[in-house]
Amino acid sequence: MDFILGGVAACGACFFTNPLEVVKTRMQLQGELKSRGTYQVYYRNVFHAFYTIGKIDGLAGLQKGLVPGLVYQFFMNGVRLGSYALTESLGYIHTDGRVSATKSTVSGAIAGVVGAVMGSPIYLVKTHLQSQSTSSIAVGHQYKHRGMTNALFAIHKQHGILGLWRGASAAIPRVSVGSAAQLATFSASKEMVNDLQVFSEGSWLIALSAGMISSVVVVLAMTPFDVVSTRLYNQPVDHLGKGMLYRGFVDCFSKTLKKEGMTGLYKGLGASYFRLGPHTILSLLFWNELRCLHQSYS
């Protein structure tokens, strides 16, 4: 049941934050491997990106990739949050009745790796669909998929089953780092807020406060990995399915750092927080409340 609750909670958050994911993806691909001032800026900031996409691609453009986004969140976070909840219920993340920073971080990272591997094909398709736009504001390589199913069949037909896991080398560090940061800080923050007795015991405000603290840590830790992941998933490939811009995670990381500097790895930081912040807060809040609701009826 923990796996289903985790998936449902993440889907609830995804429905509200998907437009922010579209904006984040576009901003991370803008000026790829180009020095500042040498490329046309279509999206000046988060708000300008919202306006531009809404104006040129239409309001539906802001919800591009929603279907694969929901599928990805259900399976990836279902496995990730469900695995973590299982280790938590077995008492593994606690030492002497208190949350262990080391154990909760390791548990979060392992849960993230499992979720990332399972969800990688859907994340690949989601990235392709969210980067697709009208030519006048296009950034990154433009695939011409007609939808999630069409994309999965097209990739499988051209590059085989392994082609669906292209980019997984970036997804694993991305999700493991993000998961470790998110779940460890959420567990510790929830315990801290409880100790301060700011809210009544069992209040949903405890989970909300812990989620807000966790969201800041997640964005700072995850953004460089998120930029690399987006670029690896979206890069054009040759007839053998090999990337034409990057050989893998380390190559993409080093090329981005060399060409665009440290700011390149934090491209779209504002968009990342606007997306990952609310998503982290909402998914953790929904997850916590659904678990409490399930426990009260079981």
From Swiss-Prot:
UniProt entry keywords in alphabetical sequence: Membrane, Mitochondrion, Mitochondrion inner membrane, Repeat, Transmembrane, Transmembrane helix, Transport
Major location category of this protein: mitochondrion
Location in or out of the cell: Mitochondrion inner membrane
Its membrane topology: Multi-pass membrane protein
PROSITE patterns noted in UniProt: SOLCAR
Solcar repeat extents: 1-90, 99-192, 202-293
Residues that span the membrane, as ranges: 38-58, 59-79, 91-118, 168-189, 204-224, 276-296
Family annotation (Gene3D superfamilies): Mitochondrial carrier domain (1.50.40.10)
Entry GO CC: mitochondrial inner membrane
UniProt KW Transport keyword: yes
Similarity comment text for this entry: Belongs to the mitochondrial carrier (TC 2.A.29) family.
Name this polypeptide is given: Solute carrier family 25 member 35
Gene giving rise to this polypeptide: slc25a35
